[in-house]
Amino acid sequence: MKDKKNYIDHIPKINDMKWDVSEDGIVEITVENTGFYNTIAQKIFKKPRYSFIKLDEYGSFVWQKIDGKKSIYEIGKELQAVHEGAATQLYERLSQYFAILERNKYIIFEE
Protein backbone atom coordinates (compact mmCIF):
# COMPACT_ATOMS: atom_id res chain seq x y z
CA MET A 1 0.00 0.00 0.00
CA LYS A 2 1.26 3.47 -0.86
CA ASP A 3 2.22 5.75 1.99
CA LYS A 4 0.16 8.91 1.46
CA LYS A 5 1.62 12.14 2.77
CA ASN A 6 -0.72 14.61 4.47
CA TYR A 7 -1.06 17.78 2.37
CA ILE A 8 -0.07 20.08 5.25
CA ASP A 9 3.21 18.15 5.59
CA HIS A 10 4.32 19.36 2.15
CA ILE A 11 7.14 21.89 2.00
CA PRO A 12 6.40 24.79 -0.38
CA LYS A 13 9.08 26.73 -2.24
CA ILE A 14 8.55 29.96 -4.17
CA ASN A 15 8.90 29.40 -7.89
CA ASP A 16 11.26 31.66 -9.82
CA MET A 17 9.17 34.82 -9.47
CA LYS A 18 9.86 38.49 -8.88
CA TRP A 19 8.12 39.86 -5.80
CA ASP A 20 8.43 42.83 -3.45
CA VAL A 21 7.17 43.80 -0.02
CA SER A 22 5.68 47.27 0.41
CA GLU A 23 6.27 49.44 3.47
CA ASP A 24 3.01 48.22 5.01
CA GLY A 25 4.10 44.56 4.66
CA ILE A 26 1.92 43.66 1.66
CA VAL A 27 3.52 41.35 -0.91
CA GLU A 28 3.18 42.20 -4.61
CA ILE A 29 4.02 39.44 -7.10
CA THR A 30 5.04 40.42 -10.63
CA VAL A 31 3.75 38.03 -13.30
CA GLU A 32 4.84 38.28 -16.93
CA ASN A 33 1.98 37.67 -19.37
CA THR A 34 3.55 35.36 -21.95
CA GLY A 35 2.17 33.09 -24.62
CA PHE A 36 0.52 33.46 -27.98
CA TYR A 37 -2.84 34.89 -26.83
CA ASN A 38 -1.23 37.27 -24.35
CA THR A 39 1.07 38.58 -27.09
CA ILE A 40 -1.92 39.25 -29.34
CA ALA A 41 -3.80 40.96 -26.49
CA GLN A 42 -0.77 43.13 -25.76
CA LYS A 43 -0.46 44.25 -29.37
CA ILE A 44 -4.12 44.66 -30.31
CA PHE A 45 -5.82 45.56 -27.04
CA LYS A 46 -2.84 47.29 -25.41
CA LYS A 47 -2.89 44.86 -22.48
CA PRO A 48 0.09 45.16 -20.10
CA ARG A 49 3.04 42.81 -20.37
CA TYR A 50 3.17 42.40 -16.60
CA SER A 51 0.46 41.88 -14.01
CA PHE A 52 0.97 42.87 -10.39
CA ILE A 53 -0.77 40.62 -7.86
CA LYS A 54 -1.21 42.09 -4.37
CA LEU A 55 -1.76 39.63 -1.54
CA ASP A 56 -3.82 40.42 1.54
CA GLU A 57 -2.40 40.60 5.08
CA TYR A 58 -2.60 36.85 5.77
CA GLY A 59 -1.41 35.90 2.28
CA SER A 60 1.55 38.26 2.58
CA PHE A 61 2.50 36.83 5.96
CA VAL A 62 2.32 33.27 4.64
CA TRP A 63 4.22 34.15 1.43
CA GLN A 64 7.10 35.61 3.42
CA LYS A 65 7.31 32.43 5.52
CA ILE A 66 7.77 30.18 2.47
CA ASP A 67 11.46 29.31 2.53
CA GLY A 68 11.68 25.77 1.15
CA LYS A 69 12.28 24.39 4.65
CA LYS A 70 9.01 24.88 6.57
CA SER A 71 5.96 22.71 6.00
CA ILE A 72 2.47 24.13 5.56
CA TYR A 73 1.75 22.93 9.10
CA GLU A 74 4.69 24.92 10.53
CA ILE A 75 3.71 28.04 8.57
CA GLY A 76 0.16 27.64 9.92
CA LYS A 77 1.45 27.51 13.51
CA GLU A 78 3.37 30.77 12.95
CA LEU A 79 0.31 32.40 11.38
CA GLN A 80 -1.86 31.30 14.30
CA ALA A 81 0.64 32.70 16.83
CA VAL A 82 0.70 36.13 15.19
CA HIS A 83 -2.90 36.48 13.98
CA GLU A 84 -5.44 35.19 16.50
CA GLY A 85 -8.29 35.54 14.02
CA ALA A 86 -6.65 33.05 11.65
CA ALA A 87 -7.44 30.05 13.88
CA THR A 88 -10.89 29.37 12.40
CA GLN A 89 -10.54 26.54 9.86
CA LEU A 90 -6.87 27.45 9.54
CA TYR A 91 -5.52 24.37 7.79
CA GLU A 92 -8.47 24.02 5.43
CA ARG A 93 -7.94 27.60 4.29
CA LEU A 94 -4.18 27.20 4.07
CA SER A 95 -4.59 24.04 2.00
CA GLN A 96 -6.83 25.90 -0.45
CA TYR A 97 -4.47 28.88 -0.54
CA PHE A 98 -1.44 26.71 -1.31
CA ALA A 99 -3.41 24.76 -3.94
CA ILE A 100 -4.20 28.07 -5.69
CA LEU A 101 -0.57 29.18 -5.48
CA GLU A 102 0.55 25.84 -6.93
CA ARG A 103 -2.09 25.89 -9.70
CA ASN A 104 -0.90 29.35 -10.76
CA LYS A 105 2.72 28.12 -10.64
CA TYR A 106 3.71 30.65 -7.97
CA ILE A 107 5.08 27.84 -5.78
CA ILE A 108 6.33 24.29 -6.12
CA PHE A 109 6.51 21.59 -3.46
CA GLU A 110 9.82 20.12 -2.36
CA GLU A 111 9.99 16.34 -2.30
Residue map of PLM features:
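Long, charge-rich, low-complexity alpha-helical segments
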Residues: 2-10, 44-111
